[in-house]
């Protein structure tokens, strides 16, 4: 989602050539470059799924999202070096993330859809394995850690073995959970409601907020709202690691310091995250809302 490929003078030319907006100044925040025009702030977000953006456009212009700015051609997607971007006007929303996660959501259709997580994860496993062959023995930090996270990925896929023909309603969900990108149209997709809740639990851990919150109370409060077998599978699924490998691949296998530091931090947190999942699993077992999983050790 970030505008990694639009930096320096390039961004000024990009906006000048595509939009009727003059840049007064710019600054970096939340992994984006912000551009000020009078008292308005704008930023560019990469479009990873153009089809998804078109499909959900009605919700973006009628809901609480950052405003999409049309370009000079009357289109909302602009292209630079074969990558698609949108310009968004920042709107300040005052909200508590936990309130939005817990809030009852309306399904976007009265027709249930097939859950595709398992197939997506299998495809991603094959894709990462193929790409990894190009950098074997190039980066020790990946060579020494990738088998562990492959193991987690296989475990998550295994947990969904009974959900290959599972149907449920779809909701507006988020690719990533964080405060700033919560209202970013490029961060929205259709999925089952378990996606946001499980990713919120991940967010609490990796933002180090879980120590200040009673996770067991969050779980118990939502026992009747979610399928916790799906949530456990998604908690185990190590997208936080493989997303960084995706960035490395997108960056032509050039390892920048940000990616290195983030992977290093994830590896340092492995034991703590296992304990975190174990504690959540214990609460779920005690409340009989989940199947027993032999490979999860209760600490």
PLM-predicted stretches and their roles:
Residues 242-299:
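ATP/Mg2+ or Mg2+-diphosphate-binding catalytic cores
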Residues 230-236:
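Central hydrophobic cores of alpha-helical transmembrane segments
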Residues 181-229:
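Active-site Asp-x-Gly
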Residues 25, 115-176, 212, 276-299:
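ATP-dependent phospho-/nucleotidyl transfer catalytic cores
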Residues 202, 209, 219-223, 236, ...:
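Hydrophobic alpha-helix feature that most strongly marks membrane-spanning transmembrane helices
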Residues 29-31:
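Membrane-cytosol interface segments
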Residues 1-24:
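Juxta-kinase regulatory segment immediately upstream of eukaryotic protein kinase catalytic domains
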Residues 36-113:
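ATP-binding pocket architecture of kinase catalytic cores
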